[in-house]
Structure formats: structure tokens, C-alpha cells
């Protein structure tokens, strides 16, 4: 029986990178972000370390790509949920859906379960990517950085210190977020 070569046909580099990222996602979800190991990844993908480095980069690039793919899925779900909404209704929906999607995503769960008090996680609040996505998803005007930063911090706070149940959280978001963005 002949085994098919997953690197034959099409764009080999893209095929290899996608396979590497999928395996890295599984390993990271299982073992944690800091436990990503190139040898284990190469074994999982059935390729050499050189193929990993050539097609996907080092650990940092692979972790970034895995997180980017996870974020893209979350962003698409939020974007779909807020389509056609505006103002405070859009912002409340965006926050609620983002919280639900991050919590249901294995990498989202992992990221927030490993954050401990006192750690420097300013990259979450200062990231231009996070700022751009928050601006876009919430329908805010470009340049309203204070509103964007506040929304990002609200979401992070609710992820880090969750409310007892979803209904209470939804009431809190509606009660305190909606008036802040009422026209």
C-alpha cells in the first residue's frame, strides 16, 4: 500500500504550513502555549524540523500564526453577529459574542486560564491588532482610542473575572455598556 505524500501537488509551502499550524494548534491546546516543542511538532506532522522552520518559521511565528487563526474565527463570528447593528446595540452584541466565542475556543480558554495577576499583559491592551479589531467590530470611529481601550479592558475583565452566570453577565453588559454608547 502506498502512502500519499501530503507535500505533492498544489502549493507545497502553503500545504505544509497549514498542516503545521493545525498540528501546532492541537499541541498548544493540549499542552499549553509555552510547551510548544519543535521536535514534538515535527513528529506530529511527520516531517523534519527543517520543514517546520522553512515552511512555518520558529516557535514564535508558529504561536503567532496559531493565535491569529483562532482570533480570525472569533472575529468572523462577532462580525456575523453584529452585521446590520449600530450604536450601543452593536457594541453590546459585539462584547457578548466575543466573550462567548473566546470562552468556547480552546486557545481562548488556554490563554485566559494561564494569565495570573501581576503578569505584564499590556500587549493585550496595547496591540494595534486588538485595537483595530475592536474598532471595526464595535463600529467605532477611527481615532476614538479611549473608547476602544475601554471596551478591550471590559472584555478582558469579564474574561479574567467572570460573572456567576451568562444571564447576569448579559444584564451587566446591557446596563453599563449600553448607556455609555447611547446616541
Task: List PLM regions with ranges.
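Amphipathic alpha-helical packing segments from all-alpha helical-bundle domains
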Residues: 75, 110, 116-149
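Amphipathic alpha-helical interaction segments
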Residues: 19, 40, 69, 89-97, ...
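Hydrophobic alpha-helical connector segments
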Residues: 61, 65-68, 78-104
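Solvent-exposed, amphipathic alpha-helical segments
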Residues: 23-30, 73, 77-84, 154-162
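C-terminal peripheral helix-coil segments that are non-catalytic and often amphipathic
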Residues: 1-4, 131-149, 154-183
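Basic, helix-initiating cap at the start of DNA-binding domains
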Residues: 1-44, 61-64, 69
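Short hydrophobic/aromatic patch on the recognition helix
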Residues: 45-56
Amino acid at each position: 500500500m502506498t502512502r500519499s505524500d501530503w507535500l505533492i501537488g498544489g502549493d507545497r509551502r502553503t500545504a505544509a504550513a497549514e498542516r503545521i499550524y493545525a498540528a501546532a494548534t492541537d499541541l498548544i491546546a493540549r499542552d499549553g502555549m509555552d510547551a510548544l516543542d519543535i521536535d514534538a511538532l515535527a513528529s506530529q506532522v511527520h516531517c523534519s524540523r527543517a520543514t517546520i522552520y522553512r515552511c512555518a518559521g520558529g516557535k514564535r511565528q508558529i504561536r503567532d500564526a496559531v493565535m491569529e487563526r483562532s482570533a480570525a474565527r472569533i472575529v468572523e463570528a462577532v462580525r456575523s453577529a453584529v452585521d446590520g447593528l449600530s450604536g450601543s446595540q452593536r457594541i453590546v452584541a459585539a462584547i457578548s459574542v466575543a466573550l462567548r466565542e473566546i470562552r468556547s475556543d480552546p486557545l481562548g480558554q488556554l490563554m485566559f486560564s494561564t494569565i495570573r495577576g501581576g503578569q505584564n499583559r499590556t500587549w493585550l491592551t496595547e496591540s494595534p491588532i486588538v485595537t483595530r479589531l475592536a474598532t471595526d467590530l464595535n463600529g467605532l470611529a477611527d481615532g476614538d482610542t479611549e473608547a476602544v481601550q475601554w471596551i478591550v479592558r471590559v472584555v478582558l475583565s469579564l474574561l479574567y473575572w467572570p460573572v456567576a452566570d451568562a444571564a447576569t453577565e448579559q444584564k451587566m453588559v446591557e446596563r453599563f455598556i449600553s448607556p455609555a454608547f447611547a446616541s
